Amino acid sequence: MTIGLKNRLNNWRDSEVTPPHIPEVCPKIDVPSEWAQQALAFEPSPKQKQILDDPGHRLILNCARQWGKTTVIAVKALHEALHNPKINIMVLSRTKQQAALTIHKVREFAALLDIKRRRYQSREHSVELPNGSAIFAIAHNAATAVGNTVHIAVVDEAAVVEDDVFAAILPSIARTKGKLWLLSTPSGPTGMFYKIWHDESLGNWTRITATVDDVAYADKEVLQLETRLFPNRADQDFYCKFVQPAGRLVDPALLERVVNHNIEPIDLDRYRKKP
């Protein structure tokens, strides 16, 4: 990041409206990773570049803790919003505070570009851009997910989002033929995130894994300590494995593999004595 961009961000106080947009500061570049480099001075890693430039409608990211998934998705969302007028991007997470982090990142990047912006429909965690596109966060419940029509649905910490909330999100992108981006660290071999990650029959998904080995700044001493003290947790948080929770006697994935869904049910009425 250049000194000028740093100073611009340091002087920003998250005002409701920033100075007028300066066109040359925000060039229209169709390739997101190139735009991030030129407009934001954001240098993506090879894995982040893959995420930014993926054009698919279905994207699922299996990421280590502190890998930077929120930041890279904020960059990707802002690029989509700036380059596609009048689209809505909805962000949901297990807590509204977590979803708000993505919005905060978006606002930070918009401030770097001196983009005029305001809240969308007076929502607390939102940003509306001059071209009419909006990015907003919603709470983790089916009631608030229903009724939104969006072009991109972003689900952060998707491994801990409840199934009924997932079910409520899908209609929001049906009319627009919208995109669905899921990002999370695993949380056991259960739930929609686990199912979508493993079931290739669920459509054309781009699946990207980013372990701690893709994090250049990871503290090796901390990794070794957690690996020795909490090996299962280290496998999950750092190496993106769907680990069985400690203390559980039966592995649901194992049960699923041994169940034969082709067996027809027994007609018990045949064996009942007639009066």
Predicted region positions:
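Pre-P-loop entry segment of helicase/translocase ATPase cores
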Residues: 1-58, 268, 273
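Residue-level preference for the first positions of well-ordered beta-strands
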Residues: 58-60, 88-90, 152, 179
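Conserved H-loop
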Residues: 66, 94, 185
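Inter-Walker segment of RecA-like/P-loop motor cores
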Residues: 100-151
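ASCE P-loop NTPase helicase motor core
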Residues: 108-110, 152, 160-233
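ATPase catalytic-site recognition across NTP-hydrolyzing enzymes
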Residues: 212-275
